[in-house]
Amino acid sequence: MTFDSSPIAAIATAPGRGGIGVVRISGKDLSSVMRAVCGADKGSSLQARHATYLDFVNSDGSVIDQGLAIYFKAPHSYTGEDVLELQGHGGPVVLQMLLTRCLEAGADIGLRMAEPGEFTHRAFLNDKLDLAQAEGVIDLIEASTEAAAKSATQSLSGAFSKTIQELVDKITNLRMLVEATLDFPEEEIDFLEKSDARGQLTNIREALQRVFSQAAQGALLRDGLNIVLAGQPNVGKSSLLNALAGSDVAIVTPIAGTTRDKVIETIQIEGIPVNVIDTAGIRDAADAGDEVERIGIERTWAAVQTADVIVHMLDASRGPTRADEQITERFPANVPVMRVWNKIDLSGHRPAIDRMPDATHIYLSATGLLGMDLLRTELLHLVGWQQTGESLYLARERHLVALKSAHSHLEMAAQHAAHDNEATDPALDLFAEELRLAQERLSSITGEFTSDDLLGVIFSRFCIGK
C-alpha cells in the first residue's frame, strides 16, 4: 500500500439502513471542510472531543441532514491526525449525499475517498497502534463467536503485542551479553557464565513455546474448523448434521442418494466456529442413480481435500464392509480421520470412544442423540484444542509462522551455546546471529520489521471506513 498523506473521507458505518450513520474524515487541516459542511459559525467553533448538534449543509445552504459533529484534534484521535466525524441518520442515500458534500467541500485541500483500511493504516503509521493491534481491529469486527471476540480484544488492547515485546526485550538483553563477550575478548570476566546466559535462553524458549500454544489455540477461534462428513449412502451423515445443528437442516430419507450436494451448517463447540459439511453418499459410479448423484460424489471428494477433520460415518448395525475400506484408502494421509459408528441403537453398542492406532472410533446414535458429547469433545481433541483457562490471542497464520521461525532460531542458538566457547570461537558469532534472527522474526508480528507489500495485504482486508 503506497502511502498518500492527503486527507481522506468515507462512510464508517456498515452498508444498509440504520438509526445512525457516520461519515469520517481524517487529515492534517480540516477547518475548511468543517466550515463548509457544518456552517460558518458552528463549523468554526467546534471544540475538540465535544459533540455539537447542527445542520449539515450544501453549498447553497440547504440542509442535507441534522446530527452531531465531533472533532478530534491531532494527535488525540484514532488516526493520529485531525479527525472529523459527522453522525447523522443511517440511510444509505442521505449518507452518500453527506459524503459527496464533504468531498466537494474538501476538494481544495485534496480530500479524497479512503482506501479499505486506510484509517487504521494511518493509525499504525502514526504509532497509535502496532500491526498486531491493527489486525485485532478487523478480527473483532469479523468475530463469529463470543470467545473469538474476547480473544480479539486481547490483541486490540495490546496484550499480545506486550507479550511479544517482552520476549524481544529478553532476547535483546541476551544479545548484549553475547556481543559484549565478542567485543571484549581480552576481559577476564566471562559475561555469559556470570549472567547464566544459557539459563536465560532456556527460559526464553519455554516462554516462547507457551505463547505459541496460546496463539495456536486462538487461531482455532479465529479460523474455525471444517468438518466433513463422508461415507456410504444411508449411514446417517445427514442425521448427524441435524443432531449437531439442533435442527433439521438436511433432508433425511431411507432412499440412498437423498443428499446430492454439500450442505453446510456452522455450529459452535466451546466457542469455536465449526463448519459441518454434509456430503453425498459415496458409492461406485455404476451404482449412482443419475448424473446429478455422480457429480455430488465428485464434490464429496473435493470437500474431503479441504477438511480439517474427516468424520468417516459407518453403520454399526452391519459392521465394516469392503466399500468402507475403499473409502478409507482414498482419504488424504495428512488429515485427521475420526471413524463414527452410527446406529448403535440398532447394534446394541453403548456410547463409547476408542482411540486406536489407525484412528479414533466413536460409537453413537445420531437419531437417538446418544454419544454426541463424546463426538464434540473428540473433534476438538483431534485438532489440539485445550481448555486451559488462559487468555488466548486470536493469532493469524503469519503470527504462527513467525513464532515457529523464532523458536527454530532459538533452538539453533541453544546448540551453539551448548559448547564452552572462547570469545574468538566462530560458534559464538553464530549464537549472536541466531538471536538476532529470532528477535527480527518476533518483531515482524508487531510491524517493527514488515514489508510494504505485507502491510498492503493486511490493511486491504478492512472495510473502507475503517
Curated annotation (Swiss-Prot):
Its cofactor is K(+). One of its GO terms (molecular function) is metal ion binding. Keywords: Cytoplasm, GTP-binding, Hydrolase, Magnesium, Metal-binding, Nucleotide-binding, Potassium, tRNA processing. GO terms for cellular component: cytosol. Binds 1 potassium ion per subunit. K(+) binds at N234, T253, I255, T258. Homodimer. Heterotetramer of two MnmE and two MnmG subunits. This is tRNA modification GTPase MnmE.
